[in-house]
């Protein structure tokens, strides 16, 4: 039987960042949650797709909640306690992801909406006819 060789690849170093920034990008199709330290170095991230949802289910609030819980748990394992939340995008999972971060035990110090709003720039997509 073959022995497994221990790989000496890149290892995740423990950051011990107590404060950080949580970026929530919520689109109509997916929600991506990235937790960084104050410098902007990523500590943990998760998305609806990475949490096991596929297709149209990725855009649901429950998928966003699952992604936020997963990212928050990883960040708290690295010592994070407080976070600022920057929300971006028009998706369904915005509020649910913030509530999931609070429920996971992270103290939220600031919630800021950084969704870019055009000064009448590009033409939006046409309305769906179902």
From Swiss-Prot:
Keywords: Chloroplast, Plastid, Ribonucleoprotein, Ribosomal protein, RNA-binding, rRNA-binding. Signal peptide: none annotated. Pfam families: Ribosomal_S11. Its main location: plastid. One of its GO terms (cellular component) is ribosome. Gene3D superfamilies: Ribosomal protein S11. GO terms for molecular function: rRNA binding; structural constituent of ribosome. It is found in: Plastid, Chloroplast. It comes from the Eukaryota. PROSITE patterns: RIBOSOMAL_S11 (PS00054). Coiled coil: none annotated. GO terms for biological process: translation. Belongs to the universal ribosomal protein uS11 family. Part of the 30S ribosomal subunit. This is Small ribosomal subunit protein uS11c. It comes from Porphyra purpurea (Red seaweed). The lineage of its organism: Eukaryota, Rhodophyta, Bangiophyceae, Bangiales, Bangiaceae.
């Amino acid at each position: 039987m073959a022995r497994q060789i221990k790989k000496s690849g890149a290892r995740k170093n423990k950051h011990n960042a107590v404060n950080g920034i949580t970026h929530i990008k919520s689109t109509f199709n997916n929600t991506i949650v990235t937790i960084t330290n104050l410098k902007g170095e990523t500590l943990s991230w998760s998305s609806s797709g990475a949490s096991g949802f596929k297709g149209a289910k990725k855009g649901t609030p429950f998928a966003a909640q699952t992604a936020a819980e997963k990212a928050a748990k990883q960040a708290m394992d690295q010592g994070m306690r407080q976070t600022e939340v920057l929300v971006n995008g028009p998706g369904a999972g915005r509020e649910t992801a913030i509530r999931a971060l609070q429920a996971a035990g992270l103290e939220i110090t600031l919630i800021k909406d950084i969704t870019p709003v055009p000064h009448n720039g590009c033409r939006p997509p046409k309305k769906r006819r179902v």
